[in-house]
Every structure is written in C-alpha cells, then in structure tokens.
Curated annotation (Swiss-Prot):
Ranges for region Fructose-2,6-bisphosphatase: 251-471
Organism: Bos taurus
Active-site residues, record numbering mapped to chain: 131, 161, 259 (tele-phosphohistidine intermediate), 328 (proton donor/acceptor)
Protein name: 6-phosphofructo-2-kinase/fructose-2,6-bisphosphatase 1
Protein role: Synthesis and degradation of fructose 2,6-bisphosphate.
Amino acid sequence: MSQEMGELTQTRLQKIWIPHNNGNSRLQRRRGSSIPQFTNSPTMVIMVGLPARGKTYISTKLTRYLNWIGTPTKVFNLGQYRREAVSYKNYEFFLPDNMEALLIRKQCALAALKDVHSYLSHEEGRVAVFDATNTTRERRSLILQFAKEHGYKVFFIESICNDPDVIAENIRQVKLGSPDYIDCDREKVLEDFLKRIECYEVNYQPLDDELDSHLSYIKIFDVGTRYMVNRVQDHIQSRTVYYLMNIHVTPRSIYLCRHGESELNLRGRIGGDSGLSARGKQYAYALANFIQSQGISSLKVGTSHMKRTIQTAEALGLPYEQWKALNEIDAGVCEEMTYEEIQEHYPEEFALRDQDKYRYRYPKGESYEDLVQRLEPVIMELERQENVLVICHQAVMRCLLAYFLDKSSDELPYLKCPLHTVLKLTPVAYGCKVESIYLNVEAVNTHREKPENVDITREPEEALDTVPAHY
C-alpha cells in the first residue's frame, strides 16, 4: 500500500476499544465501541400495576429499545417463574388469603431476583426489567433492600389504567393466548381473569407521591394520556422516560423500503449520491401504485437527503419530509468504491470490517453502531407516528428493522433488505408482524454475506467470494 493510501486510514489509537472478552487477537486489540455505557451501576427497572395494564408490553418494548442502543438489558417475567413452579388452575391461586400460594409466589420472586443478580453482576448485564405486579409496599421494599445490598439503582414504572375498554382489549389481545389459558373457553378466560384482577385490587398500594417521594419513578396513566415523573437520576432513567413518553398502542403500519435501484448500484459502487436507474424509476411508480392500493389513511412519508430516495418519493405524488438522519452509512474513504477496489487499496480494513461489521468504522466514515445512535431520533418519531412510509437505504433499513424485530448487533449488519421490496410492519402485542412485498421490478443484488475467511492475510478471491454480481 502506498504512503498516500496509508495516510487515509485511521490511526491505531482511533481504532482501539475494550474487547468483549479476554482474547488476545490482533482484531480484539483494535476493536472498540464508539458508544460509551452511560450506567456506572447496574439498574433494576421495576414494573408496578394491576394485571392487564400493559406491564409486559412496556417491559418488552423498553428492553428491545435499550438493547438496540447498546445497553445490555433482559426481562425477568415473574409469571414464567410461577408457571414453572406450579400449574395454573384458576383465579383462586391469587386470593389474598391463600397462604400456600403466597409462599410459592414469594419463592418465585426470590428465584427471579437471584437470576437478576447473576445477570447484572456476572453476565455483563446493565439493566434488568423485573416484570411483575409488585402491587404492595412489602414486595417493593423487598426489592429495594435487594438492590441496596448489591449496589443496583432502582427505577419504578407504574402503569395505571381505569378505562374498562382498554383493559378488556388488553385481555382480548394478550391474555386469551396466555399459557395459563391454553384450550380454554373465551368467556371463561375473561371471567377468570377479571376475578384475578379483583384479587390484586384488595391489597393494591400504588406508588405514593409523599411516602415514595424519595424513589425514582414514572407513572403512566391510561396508556399515555398523562405521566408523572419523579427523581430521574441518571442517563438511562432519562432515556427510559423519554422513550416511554413516545410510544403508543394505536393500531398502525410502518412501511420500510429502500430507494429504487440507483446508477451506482448498477456499477457495484457503495455510497455516493447518484440518481435512479431506468429500473429504479420504474420501481418508484410501482411503489406509488402499491401505496395507493393500500388505502392508507393519514400516511406520513419520510426520505433521506439523498437524490435516490427523493426521486423515489416524488413519484408518490404525496407530501414527504426529508430527514438527514436517514442518510446512508458514511463509507468515508471508501465512498463510491467497488468491493474489489476496497480489497485492492485497503485489504486490512476490508478484513477488519468482515470480522466485526457492526462496530467497524470506515476510515473517516461511520460504523453501524454510529448509525444506530444517529437513527435514535428516527425511532422516536416512528413510535410517535401512526401510518408511515420510510424510503431509505440498505444500512439504515437494517438498523430500523433490527429495532422492530429485536435483532442482535451480530445479526443486524446481515439482515436482507433487497431493492424494490417493501416490508410492512404491523405492531402486535409483544412484537411485530412482517409482510414482505416484492413489487416485481428487477434490480441488482446488493446483499453481501459474511465470507468464511475473515483473516487479514486471506487471499483476495476469498475476500471477494460473497460479493454479489452487479448486472
């Protein structure tokens, strides 16, 4: 490599990060997470509220979000511990005077707390979400004492809902499919679960504005119509509050797609800001016809600032917003190069990217990890919106898809997001339903799988083995 080319590459100092394990490989010495961890002590997020108040929904979404931004988080659902300990018969298990059941429930809570300790203290977890009713001051005091003994921070999330229609809808969507009610009559399930709620109501002690004024918490009233926040103490708690104040449960669909095929796509070059190819323009009109056929009410459309997404959106004949955060990943010195040219001029960089595609940062460019941080405001906007179409780019779409489908950082850079295909995401109880719609306009394949040999000393043909044909 020439001296001129060498100067383009980042310095060793800029590439160093703390390895995820104790390995001594050259890559591990150069690896680094550009995103700092904002918690100096592990955090326990404690759910509070009666059954059918959306606690598990909140727990699942919050965990997905925190993992996506790079904070290792895990849900500990007490219902799962209880089902492993004893089979469910009916609501009588939850009667406040059922002493045998009370003992079992406490033992389950202690078992879950033991697993929380293992996760936060021995498995590099940063946030544990304790998903249970935790409706009594006695139970919350037990948790607070546990957290104090182990040096964990505590943040409470209480979900309060008195709207019978919302409660009934939650029971219909979630509880009818619960493992507690397999093969049970629908009406009997509803009757039993309402009686279960009554059992909890007897001893329910909500967080108190005066008695609990020293605690950190957020109260969510009637699925987000009102909030009360108290003593937010650190960055993670602040981000949690911000996130929870943006999510909603209104039925909607999120449409994700890439721009139409571009001129640089045809030439096998990454990045750049070229316009659409002839087939790309054909796709733009096919997309317009598809969106019209969906009959979507109040559709909001977002694009990046790049020509190829704007040209794709123009064909829709709808208003659209340009979001700079949706711009494609910055390939730095590799912008508008083919994979063959990157291998020729920067073989070491090409290998390092294959070794850790999520954290690798292009010289003078970005990593997928950087891109996730850039896209966080987009996620907040998507959570706030109802029906929305996002016309973006391959790396950007992978990051957004990883959030909605709860994919790991290892899976994220290899998610398949082909050209001329729309992904329709419909949020459901604890996840997303995905429909893939190919609009029948041919395009080049831009998906490159991870090659078998990722060593720096590999032969060029091994490095280029998985490069797709661009014709």
